Regions:
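Active-site proximal beta-strand in glycosyltransferases
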Residues: 124-130, 140-159, 174-177
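Donor nucleotide-sugar binding/catalytic pocket of nucleotide-sugar-dependent glycosyltransferases
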Residues: 151, 158-159, 169-203
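Short hydrophobic beta-strand element within catalytic cores of glycosyltransferases
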Residues: 283-292
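Nucleotide-sugar-dependent
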Residues: 267-278, 292-306
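Conserved donor-binding/catalytic core segment of Leloir-type glycosyltransferases
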Residues: 6, 203-223, 229
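A charged, aromatic-enriched C-terminal amphipathic alpha-helix characteristic of glycosyltransferases
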Residues: 327-358
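Short N-terminal targeting/anchoring amphipathic segment
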Residues: 4-9, 98-104, 114-135
Length: 364
C-alpha cells in the first residue's frame, strides 16, 4: 500500500532529507520535505519556506546566546537543560514577546504552504527537531485530530538546550534519534543509525607521500577544534603531516577535500554530543582512517566500531603513532568502510525505519 510521507525540518542540514525522499520513493511511496530555511551547505531543497529569523546563522546564533546568558548564566544557550525529558518554555517576558511576534510573522507563510501542498493529507509526518512550525503547535494538533502518525526525530540541541515541545511530546507515536547521549534525555526515545549512501565513494588504496590530516568543523566549540588545530599545526610545522582545515565551504568542496585526506579527525570532547556524526560517516565511507573521542557508554553501545579513540591528552601521541605505521592507516580505513556499510547504508537504515513504521501501525 502506497504511503504519503512528510518531513518537516528547520534545515536540510546534512543532506539526509534528500536521501530519505529518494529512498521512500524507491519503495513506491510519496515523500515531500518542507524546510524553514535554505540549506547552508546547498543541499537540494524540495519545499523551502525561506522564513525570517534563522537562528542557525552565525550572527543570530551569537545574539541568541548573548540573550540566553541573562537567564541561564555564563553558558547561555549551550547550557544543558534539566529534565527527562527537558521541556521547552519561553525564558522571560522578552523571549515570550519575540516568539509571539515571530509566529505572527510566520503564520500566513505556513498556512499558505499547508494549503498549496495539502500537508494535512499525509499519512505520517516526521518532525525533524521535534518541532512544529509555530510554538502554539497548531499543525500537530490538527494532525492528531485527523489521526495521522506523528514521529519526532531529535538531534543535539533539540534536547540538550531546548527541550521537547509540550504538546507534540504527548501525542508522538514514535521518537527517534541518531545520537546515543540523547537516549538518556528522554524515556521514550529509540535509536536509528544516521543514513548515508555509503556506495558513493570508492575506498582509497594508497596514501599521500606526506600524510594528509583533515578536520571539518561546522562548530569549533562543539568539535573541540582549537585543540585539534593546535596539535595538527604543530605536526605540520615539524613537516610530519599536511593539515587541511575544512570549513566555510560548500558541501561538494568539503567532500572533495576530505577525500584527499589519509586521516580524518571528527571531534575531541563531548560538548556537542558524543562520538561522531555525518562527518565521520562520510570519511568512513571513503575508507579514511577516522579519529574521534568515544566514551565508555558509546564504546559499549557500538563495541566493534572502527574509530581510533583519541582524547585531548592522546591526540598528539596517536597521530605520531599512525604517521609511523602507514599500513595501520590503510587497514583502519578498510575496516571503517566495511563497518559503515553494515550500519549506516541507507538501505539498511531504511529497513530499520520501516520496522518502526510497522510497530506504530503503518502498513508498509
Amino acid at each position: 500500500m502506497k504511503m504519503k510521507i512528510l518531513y518537516i525540518s528547520p534545515e536540510n542540514t546534512v543532506g539526509t532529507l534528500t536521501l530519505w525522499k529518494k529512498e521512500h520513493e524507491s519503495r513506491g511511496n510519496e515523500c515531500r520535505t518542507v524546510t524553514f530555511f535554505a540549506s547552508p551547505k546547498n543541499f537540494k531543497e524540495d519545499i523551502c519556506l525561506e522564513l525570517p529569523f534563522n537562528f542557525t546563522m552565525p550572527g543570530l546564533a551569537k545574539l541568541r546566546n548573548i540573550f540566553y546568558k541573562r537567564y541561564r548564566g555564563r553558558e547561555g544557550y549551550f547550557k544543558i537543560k534539566e529534565g527527562n525529558p527537558p521541556i521547552w518554555e519561553p525564558e522571560g517576558w522578552l523571549d515570550k514577546t519575540f516568539l509571539k511576534f515571530k509566529d505572527w510573522l510566520w503564520r500566513p507563510i505556513v498556512e499558505k504552504a499547508i494549503d498549496d501542498y495539502q500537508l494535512y493529507d499525509f499519512d505520517v509526518v516526521h518532525f525533524e527537531s521535534g518541532m512544529d512550525f509555530l510554538k502554539n503547535e497548531f499543525f500537530v494538533k490538527e494532525l492528531k485530530a485527523r489521526e495521522k502518525k506523528i514521529i519526532c526525530h531529535y538531534h543535539g540541541e533539540d534536547l540538550r538546550s531546548r527541550g521537547v515541545m509540550p504538546y507534540i511530546d504527548t501525542v508522538a507515536d514514535l521518537n527517534l534519534t541518531n545520537e546515543v547521549d540523547l537516549l538518556e534525555k528522554h524515556p521514550k526515545l529509540e535509536y536509528i543509525f544516521l543514513p548515508f549512501e555509503t556506495s558513493s565513494f570508492t575506498p582509497k588504496d594508497k596514501l599521500n607521500d606526506i600524510i594528509r590530516v583533515a578536520h571539518a568543523p561546522t562548530n569549533r566549540f562543539y568539535k573541540g577544534s582549537d585543540l585539534i588545530i593546535s596539535v595538527c599545526s604543530k605536526l605540520e610545522s615539524e613537516k610530519l603531516v599536511e593539515f587541511d582545515l575544512i570549513e566555510n565551504v560548500s558541501h561538494a568542496d568539503a567532500l572533495e577535500r576530505k577525500a584527499k585526506s589519509d586521516i580524518f579527525i571528527d571531534q575531541i570532547g563531548d560538548k556537542g554530543g558524543w562520538g561522531y556524526g555525518m562527518n565521520s560517516v562520510e570519511s568512513l565511507s571513503m575508507g579514511i582512517c577516522t579519529l574521534t573521542q568515544i566514551n565508555e557508554t558509546y564504546n559499549t553501545f557500538i563495541p566493534h566500531h572502527p574509530f581510533t579513540h583519541v582524547t585531548k591528552n592522546t591526540l598528539d601521541t596517536e597521530l605520531r603513532r599512525l604517521i609511523n605505521n602507514r599500513e595501520k592507516i590503510l587497514t583502519s580505513g578498510q575496516n571503517g568502510k566495511k563497518w559503515v556499510e553494515i550500519n549506516h547504508d541507507i538501505k539498511n537504515v531504511s529497513n530499520k525505519l520501516y520496522d518502526y513504521y510497522s510497530s506504530i501501525g503503518l502498513l508498509c
